[in-house]
Amino acid sequence: MKKKDKHELKPEEFCPIRQTLKTLGKRWTILIIKEAYYSKSQRISFMDLRRRLVNASAKVLSERLKDMVEEGLMRRNVHGTSTPVRVYYSLTEKGKDACRIIEDLKKYGLKWRVKETFNCENMDCELCAKKKEKALQSSLS
């Protein structure tokens, strides 16, 4: 009987879903893509991400952005020659392709997860969030 090499790859390691989740399944990655995609100019600064993703620590957010640039999901753009320079992140084609997954997640959430009556099906996420916030504030008044 032939002994298996401990470094031999298992068939499930070739699974495209598993390979995709190694990148997109990391915490905050999908939400960073969503924020960049729905930002007005389709570029976003680190500080804008910090304001929008309040539960993400600066360290984790920085690490995730670095990973996403290395993976080819985002492009890091430095503007200005004097300090402080401005750094913006924008989606690459690979990153924009992931937005289809976000739309599918939204559809799934609307069908199976969202327990409220607020309907954001035909809105982009940025507009939806603003409308929900406005509705919440008026209900508290």
Tell where the protein language model's regions lie, with residue ranges.
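C-terminal regulatory/oligomerization modules of transcriptional regulators
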Residues: M1-H7, E12, S41, R75, ...
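Beta-hairpin "wing" of winged helix-turn-helix
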Residues: K2, V69-S90
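N-terminal helix-turn-helix DNA-binding core of bacterial DNA-binding proteins
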Residues: C15-V60
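Alpha-helical hinge/cap motifs
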Residues: L24-R27, T92-K96
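Intrinsically disordered, low-complexity basic tails/linkers immediately adjacent to helix-turn-helix/homeobox/MYB/SANT
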Residues: N55-A56, E63, V85-Y88
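Basic amphipathic alpha-helical segments that dock to polyanions
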Residues: L61-E71
